[in-house]
Amino acid sequence: MQPPVPGPLGLLDPAEGLSRRKKTSLWFVGSLLLVSVLIVTVGLAATTRTENVTVGGYYPGIILGFGSFLGIIGINLVENRRQMLVAAIVFISFGVVAAFCCAIVDGVFAAQHIEPRPLTTGRCQFYSSGVGYLYDVYQTEVTCHSLDGKCQLKVRSNTCYCCDLYACGSAEPSPAYYEFIGVSGCQDVLHLYRLLWASAVLNVLGLFLGIITAAVLGAFKDMVPLSQLAYGPAVPPQTLYNPAQQILAYAGFRLTPEPVPTCSSYPLPLQPCSRFPVAPSSALASSEDLQPPSPSSSGSGLPGQAPPCYAPTYFPPGEKPPPYAP
């Protein structure tokens, strides 16, 4: 019988194939780690660009980066490799879900809430109260002109505002942001717009790369090198309980044929006899000495166990049978 495989998905791969799989896994994990660093960098740059626009696109980068770090450690481990790679796959899976959500949120926010056309055409103004004033304390009113007339807009210090996006005299707020607080110029708003789209693209890239990396690590964690293959306990030898085979296993042992049971010379009403026809006792004794053992008993090594047959005894006329003896 063949020895059992040590695991449900244990793969016997030569050392060269295992090394190639290891390099492939390291390449994918390293690429995912690099993308995670870019996601965190771009996300932090976007969320610190303004005060009133919060970006959460860097959270998937943290989760994916931690999962990639665990994956690099698990690939280079010899013992506890499977446990470490399973933990890496779990973190990468959570990072993939977070990247999917943040890619949608950042993309929708950049497309719906930031209008780049007034910024690129120079129709937005930047207001600064000067050195020594805090932008969250000092406020001023500026005049915005629209088709319906002019209106007053309160802005804080270090704010980029766009009167084209502000609905004068309208109770409904504008869907697009018309002011960006805490910037050093209106060019920072354009940078924020580009960073949001870059964060969305990087999150999509991290989404697909995370799925592929999790699949590669899942295939690598079940691989077992030939040098570390440990077979299970050996199967005990199967014992044969056939008496004939156990007896014939001893060298030089020969079976002696047992004598064939014969009928007694004393006549009885019913007496056991062999398969031979009824004969006198003297003739039966001489035939027993000359007859060789039967092939069935000598060939198989088992004693002849033919069922005894009982035949009635015939007496010549005028002779009485012997008295019955139990």
UniProtKB/Swiss-Prot annotation:
Pfam families hit by this protein: FAM70 (PF14967)
Key word Membrane present: yes
InterPro entries the UniProt entry points to: TMEM255
Localization terms from the record: Membrane
Chief place of localization: membrane
Transmembrane regions: 26-46, 55-75, 85-105, 200-220
Keyword Transmembrane in record: yes
Topology within the bilayer: Multi-pass membrane protein
Gene Ontology CC, one term: membrane
Taxonomy, superkingdom: Eukaryota
Residue ranges, annotated region (Disordered): 284-326
Positions with biased composition (Pro residues): 305-326
Keyword annotations of the record: Membrane, Transmembrane, Transmembrane helix
Family indicated by similarity: Belongs to the TMEM255 family.
Full protein name: Transmembrane protein 255B
Organism: Homo sapiens
Source taxonomy: Eukaryota, Metazoa, Chordata, Craniata, Vertebrata
